[in-house]
Amino acid sequence: MLTRRPKAWETSRVPLSDETPKPVVAAFDLDGTLTEGGSVFRWLRWIAGARRTYAAALRLAVPLTVGAVRSGRAADNAKERLFMALLAGRSEAQVTEDSREFILEHLGGRLRPKALARLRWHLEAGHDVVIVSASPQMYVNVVADQLGAHGALGTRLAADPLGHLTGGYLGRNCRGAEKMRRFNDWISERRYPEEPIVFAYGNSRGDRRLLRLATHPFNAGKLGRLGSLRRYPRLTSEPPTTA
């Protein structure tokens, strides 16, 4: 566990208010929503080293390119193959600690001001905040902890009985339908007294199902009317007038 002074972007977790007439949940995607662009490749470079990471990406150039074009299962499979090439045999505990160091070093400079302001608004209002991402669970856990979120849902990675990662998924990549399923399960586990009001923030087509089930969905993408989430209201610096 690292010991250091809190950075300016870190947020203290705010307990839920007993005075809230109806429970409110805010779900945030991570890459491209809370942060500028993707972070998984940077994370892999930090964990495995730049040379090994670029070499693995070169060997897997064809499936990675096909996955980028086709998205969906092709992208999921290519990502898993890259994880297996770079993470297999590594200590899960060590990768978790390395992830914490990576977040402390890199997250602050990549956070998007509007999204961070909205997350803080939800926390200050006593809402329950959860980060839902296709990034590895151990990585998302650290981000959620640093930002003060109440929950973290990410892609779970398999490990052997000795605690060494295989690099493969434990379940499915947390995007699209899986992201929605995991979020629904998390809501059910909270045992709210009534169905909560849901705010959801995303930036890509992998977030569409999550936004579709939200009471208040927001598009945090940079493409605006050209993006895949153009039907949804844009995230602005002004707090919403509801909830």
Walk through the language-model features, giving the residues of each:
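A general structural signal for well-ordered alpha-helical segments in protein cores
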Residues: 40-41, 80, 180
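Generic alpha-helix structural propensity
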Residues: 35-39, 60, 77-78, 90, ...
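Active-site neighborhood of HAD-like aspartate-dependent phosphohydrolases
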Residues: 10-71
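Metal-dependent phosphoesterase signature
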Residues: 78-113
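Electropositive phosphate-/nucleotide-binding environments in soluble metabolic enzymes
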Residues: 34, 89, 176-180
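Short, compositionally biased "basic patch" segments
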Residues: 65-92, 156-160
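C-terminal cap/substrate-recognition subdomain and adjoining C-terminal extension
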Residues: 2-17, 21-23, 97, 104-243
